[in-house]
Curated annotation (Swiss-Prot):
Gene source species: Corynebacterium glutamicum (strain R)
Top-level EC class: isomerase
Gene3D superfamilies attached to this UniProt entry: Nucleoside Triphosphate Pyrophosphohydrolase
Pathway assigned in UniProt: Isoprenoid biosynthesis; dimethylallyl diphosphate biosynthesis; dimethylallyl diphosphate from isopentenyl diphosphate: step 1/1
Job description of the protein: Catalyzes the 1,3-allylic rearrangement of the homoallylic substrate isopentenyl (IPP) to its highly electrophilic allylic isomer, dimethylallyl diphosphate (DMAPP).
Protein name: Isopentenyl-diphosphate Delta-isomerase
Localization of this protein: Cytoplasm
EC number: 5.3.3.2
Needed cofactors: Mg(2+); Mn(2+)
GO molecular function: isopentenyl-diphosphate delta-isomerase activity; metal ion binding
Active-site residue numbers: C69, E121
Residues annotated as binding Mg(2+): E89
Gene Ontology biological process terms from the UniProt entry: dimethylallyl diphosphate biosynthetic process; isoprenoid biosynthetic process
Length: 189
């Protein structure tokens, strides 16, 4: 039995793909710049899925964060990677995603967790709307717990207690265009 190695696409400072590396070897104290994606998932009631990272995660264990993050594989679009991770991480069906909207296409961040592990990613941010009747059943090794939150209540919590949330989520939600897109999607529901 062979296990397929998950690859991450490495990037240069201009945002060009320059190669790949196994995901298991990338997140270290000297993490190279690489491609990723970040998602904010809305249910049909317009609530946002907020997840608490599993305690077994290598980086930011137990921290509350956005709905889902991940890495597109070589020759994989962000939309396809989002669907793949939605199935693998959150237990969703591949056709659960009604709409995947890229809101912050040029988002990039670098953050260091308490253990010294670095995240350094070119990480477009997406807003995802789920179909009616879809249920989230996260894998235990990915998500410790989850909540559905009204967008404005989540924004207020992030503003009041940013230390409770992942640094990328706090930074992403400081972008007015992301908050506006979330509120517009919430109001449309």
């Amino acid at each position: 039995m062979t296990t397929e190695v998950e690859l991450v696409v490495l990037a240069d400072s201009e945002g060009n793909a320059i190669g790949t590396a196994p995901k298991a070897t990338v997140h270290t104290k000297d993490t190279p710049l690489h491609f990723a994606f970040s998602t904010y998932i809305l249910n049909p009631r317009g609530e946002l899925l907020v997840t608490r990272r599993a305690l077994s995660k290598k980086t930011w264990p137990g921290v509350w964060t956005n709905s889902m993050c991940g890495h597109p594989g070589p020759d994989e679009t962000n939309a396809d990677a989002i669907r793949r991770r939605g199935v693998d991480e959150l237990g969703l069906e591949v056709d659960s995603f009604l709409d995947i909207q890229e809101v912050l296409p040029d988002y990039q961040y670098r953050a260091v967790d308490a253990s010294g592990i670095v995240e350094w990613e070119l990480c477009p941010v997406h807003l995802v709307r789920l179909a009616v009747g879809e249920f989230v059943e996260p894998l235990d090794d990915e998500v410790e717990e989850f909540e559905w939150a009204e967008p404005q209540k989540l924004f207020d919590a992030v503003d009041a207690t940013p230390f409770v949330f992942s640094p990328w989520m706090v930074d992403q939600l400081s972008a007015p265009e992301l908050r506006q897109a979330i509120l517009e999607a919430f109001d449309a529901e």
